[in-house]
Amino acid sequence: MSFSATILFSPPSGSEARCCCCACKSETNGGNTGSQGGNPPPSTPITVTGHGLAVQSSEQLLHVIYQRVDKAVGLAEAALGLARANNELLKRLQEEVGDLRQGKVSIPDEDGESRAHSSPPEEPGPLKESPGEAFKALSAVEEECDSVGSGVQVVIEELRQLGAASVGPGPLGFPATQRDMRLPGCTLAASEAAPLLNPLVDDYVASEGAVQRVLVPAYAKQLSPATQLAIQRATPETGPENGTKLPPPRPEDMLNAAAALDSALEESGPGSTGELRHSLGLTVSPCRTRGSGQKNSRRKRDLVLSKLVHNVHNHITNDKRFNGSESIKSSWNISVVKFLLEKLKQELVTSPHNYTDKELKGACVAYFLTKRREYRNSLNPFKGLKEKEEKKLRSRRYRLFANRSSIMRHFGPEDQRLWNDVTEELMSDEEDSLNEPGVWVARPPRFRAQRLTELCYHLDANSKHGTKANRVYGPPSDRLPSAEAQLLPPELYNPNFQEEEDEGGDENAPGSPSFDQPHKTCCPDLNSFIEIKVEKDE
């Protein structure tokens, strides 16, 4: 299979370029390389032609990928073994250098003073002459570790050549002896290759065995949050102890080779190949078997499955659709459910998602309830609008409760104990202003206790949501308490709120302002937090 491609190649700058031939000179010639790192040269179009293996099906392509993965596993094991050996040597050198610094070089007692004036005894390893040569040997070991890091980077780059890793402008080095370990017939340079498939690095690290092939139903698009957190935690611990210069972890490079190597150096003892994932310091989470859904934790149904049911039901060629005027147990709606189940199973044959029949049927019934609600709202538009408004206010109360709870940890223990029994029903109703579009009018519930009301005002004064310019306070809401709210303690629920309103009449209570116009605050204790500006038209 012949191919021809034109690639826009942007050579890296002097600060980013780093290959095996200059890895050892990067520390000594740091000043020279730094002076050359100016503006990067413009992109140069490169035309590449060649021939390669003709793949007839996806199975053959996966077979080629699996062969390359097996080869990459072997290279990774070799690099890991060399890294462990260098780690043991590095630790022994550090111990000996520490003894030399402290003047605690072990001298046999029988020779005593005769050995004090003679040359020091020969020791195994690089420390034979003086501490100066020991430091030179230590730097040589560090350079050798850098070369091992380049070897590991070759493994990652080989996966990128296959399209198994995402492209990223990371500093990758390639030894001269390993430059020809790419795909046969491929003449692209390392920085010129473009990915073909989705990344497999996260799942590749998660494999247990040495030659266990990667059978992934769904390709991960990026490193899992647990993996990124583990890399961030592991990298600062390795730098001060080993004395090596560690590059910062870059999640967009899909497993930085240098960070992985330095994390592997933490494991000094020999281990089997099954310990690769543990020695790399990665906490790999499995692929999300439900796709990119579950954005909202409160969502009961899977988002991917719900969208699939919606698309199948509303397809232009589909005549079997739910009848909202009938029950779910009607013969027509039952036939629609059976039809949707058959279509969903056909759609999910090649899908990596493994849904049970119960989940499929539940998604169909949930969509029927949606169509049923739409039908009822069409019969009574005012009732539908009212339910929609109530749902919007309830959603805003949940969000307000979450915002206030997130900053409650900054308050005292007494306020935290009071907040433990608070529910979303005690939050204010953030209604849309009828006079000013885009303005929310926060109307506190009438049955909320005064102490909790003051605490809510202080929470709003210290939160980003509460101090928004488009959020103002209004009169108490007309919402009545539920049966659950009436069981709350008196510190949260005021059982005499109706009597107090009747006694107050038209006069405002002391300390509470009038609600003729929406205003920013109605608590006098907030004068130190919020600037009050009231404008009245005569």
Curated annotation (Swiss-Prot):
Transmembrane segments: none
Chain positions with Phosphoserine modification: 224, 285, 428
Cross-link (Glycyl lysine isopeptide (Lys-Gly) (interchain with G-Cter in SUMO2)): 128, 221
Keywords, alphabetical: Isopeptide bond, Phosphoprotein, Secreted, Signal, Ubl conjugation
Family annotation (Pfam families): DUF4616 (PF15394)
A single Gene Ontology CC term: extracellular region
Protein known as: Uncharacterized protein C14orf93
Organism: Homo sapiens (Human)
Gene (UniProt): C14orf93
